[in-house]
């Protein structure tokens, strides 16, 4: 029985080793990207064509690259701008609370249109472009959420909003629901600002929407919001500096290198984590077997000594 158990444990360890090797190799794809370009990056965005957008807080620059690191466009700002999740690479949206301005730029990061909110509104804390016609504005002074058509410069709707503006870092409005993100809290409201959901989230940065799915991009974690189950962690790497995803892949900057993970890679990583869990359980089983073997040996030794004494 003992030999059978040892053989079984050995075969299990071999199979786990093969899982480790396969998953480790398949789940790591380093993109050929200049590490100097990644070193001082504060945030990273990706589109569904595999292009990368790097925002540097040091000089307020926003640069677009293809997946091989070739520069496709660059913007230099004099004040901080917040980049809205990139749904359409032909029209990228940026908002500056300092400048009270929203900008739309094309695939080469050339200006398409600028919206100046200073003339028409008191103070806009945050803005979210729903499409190429209307935006949602959080007016801090009026404590209202405004639906504004910038094509004909008219306010379509105005909703009271008396929640705190101080720690707000991102806003998203979709299908009559308002998604509010602070650095450590996620909230969902209806347009009457009745709270529908609330959950803590660490080091949150921004929202991303993929069709009907609302995602939260945090420092090194990505969550998916499920109205029935709450927040579900779909990507996590404690060692990552920055993470992001498009519809097909996950991206991360780690050790000033750029990594790409396909959906298949994520499945392999889950297998790897499960294998690690099984490895720990096996190690405990081996330790238990060795302990039992040692105890059995001690008992046999005592019995031999008793026999030697003539009992």
Where are these regions (language model features)?
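Blade-level signature of beta-propeller repeat domains, shared across WD40, Kelch, NHL, RCC1
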Residues: 244-276
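Repeated scaffold domains used in trafficking and secretory/extracellular systems
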Residues: 38-45, 79-86, 121-129, 165-173, ...
């Amino acid at each position: 029985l003992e030999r059978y158990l040892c053989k079984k444990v050995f075969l299990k360890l071999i199979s786990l080793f093969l899982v480790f090797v396969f998953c480790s190799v398949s789940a790591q794809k380093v993109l050929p990207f200049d590490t100097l370009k990644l070193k001082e990056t504060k945030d990273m965005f990706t589109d569904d064509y595999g292009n990368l957008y790097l925002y540097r807080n040091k000089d307020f620059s926003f640069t677009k690259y293809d997946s091989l690191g070739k520069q496709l466009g660059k913007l230099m700002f004099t004040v901080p701008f917040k980049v809205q999740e990139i749904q359409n690479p032909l029209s990228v949206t940026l908002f500056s609370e300092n400048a009270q301005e929203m900008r739309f730029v094309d695939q080469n990061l050339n200006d398409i249109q600028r919206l100046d909110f200073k003339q028409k509104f008191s103070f806009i804390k945050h803005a979210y472009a729903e499409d190429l016609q209307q935006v949602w504005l959080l007016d801090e002074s009026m404590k209202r959420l405004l639906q504004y058509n910038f094509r004909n410069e008219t306010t379509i709707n105005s909703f009271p909003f008396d929640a705190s503006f101080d720690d707000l870092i991102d806003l998203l409005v979709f299908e009559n629901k308002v998604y509010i993100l602070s650095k450590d809290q996620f909230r969902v409201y209806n347009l009457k600002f009745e709270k529908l959901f609330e959950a803590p989230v660490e080091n949150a940065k921004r929202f991303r929407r993929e069709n009907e799915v609302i995602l939260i991009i945090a420092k090194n974690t990505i969550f998916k919001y499920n109205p029935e189950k709450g927040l579900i962690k779909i990507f996590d790497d404690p060692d990552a500096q920055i993470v992001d995803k498009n519809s097909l892949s996950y991206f991360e900057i780690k050790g000033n290198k750029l990594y790409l993970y396909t959906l298949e890679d994520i499945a392999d990583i889950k297998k790897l984590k499960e294998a690690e869990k099984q490895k720990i359980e096996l190690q405990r089983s081996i330790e238990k077997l060795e302990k039992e073997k040692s105890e059995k040996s001690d008992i046999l030794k005592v019995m031999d000594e008793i026999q030697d004494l003539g009992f």
